[in-house]
Amino acid sequence: MLIWSPKGRAAAGVVASVLFIVFFFLPLAVILMSSLSQQWNGILPSGFTLNHFVNALHGAAWDALLASLTIGFCASLFALLCGVWAALALRQYGVKTQKWLSMVFYLPSAIPSVSVGLGILVAFSQGPLQMNGTLWIVLTAHFVLISAFTFSNVSTGLARISADIENVASSLGASPWYRLRHVTLPLLMPWMMSALALSLSLSMGELGATMMIYPPGWTTLPVAIFSLTDRGNIADGAALTIVLVAITLLLMMKLERIAKRLGQK
């Protein structure tokens, strides 16, 4: 740590705790209370109800949940596949070449998501590859936005795997495909699951690009939440936000648990 004295560490801990409560816990607590409130005209809600959650789990909101899960899993799995392939392929190049080629994957993370959405909308609104108004354009945008994080996680895991392990397998007569399937991928699996969890959480919460390109019938949860709050329906929007946070956290915890279990094998 940068702070060596016990009093300094204690003070830093207090400051960090206060910042966590103010900027993370309190906003979530306010959203939760808003989702349970009948009316909120004062400092605290005047009554509590579950009707907002009932509304959040029926009709269009339920369709938005299914759309978010479908888009999130499909985009994350494709990003994971491409991230693993790219990380494995870049190992064959020198350090300088790896650095420049890696920038291709990291570039989308440096561009605002709205700009990514606009670019994809303009590029694929007419032939020869027209995807505007279809699910594919949303999947493309999510893939572009999350691929950098998937590639980064997988590359980090691959760098921690000793090359001696693969060399031993090769010296024993294992083919490249056998080494990949029985040596490299099993060792890389914990990082792959962590990358999948991170990609899924990012996709589930993506709004900027999705707002510009989503077709009818594929409204995601963030878009549905924005639409509700934009119409002044704060309580239903808050309930849907809690549903989004809960589902995303549960999925991340499950995938991270799988990754931890695989890492212990």
Curated annotation (Swiss-Prot):
Provide GO CC annotations from the record.
plasma membrane
* Disulphide connectivity of cysteines: none
Coiled-coil features, chain-numbered ranges:
none
Q: Where in the cell is it found?
A: Cell inner membrane
| ABC transmembrane type-1 domain segment(s) | 65-253
**Main location group:** membrane
Record key words, sorted: Cell inner membrane, Cell membrane, Membrane, Transmembrane, Transmembrane helix, Transport
Induction pattern: Induced when inorganic phosphate is limiting; this is controlled by PhoB.
Segments traversing the membrane: 13-33, 69-89, 104-124, 131-151, 185-205, 233-253
Describe its membrane topology: Multi-pass membrane protein
Q: One GO biological process from the UniProt record?
A: transmembrane transport
Question: What's its job?
Answer: Probably part of the PhnSTUV complex (TC 3.A.1.11.5) involved in 2-aminoethylphosphonate import. Probably responsible for the translocation of the substrate across the membrane.
Question: What's the further remark here?
Answer: Maps to a phosphate-starvation-inducible locus previously known as psiC.
Family per similarity comment:
Belongs to the binding-protein-dependent transport system permease family.
Q: Which named protein is this?
A: Putative 2-aminoethylphosphonate transport system permease protein PhnV
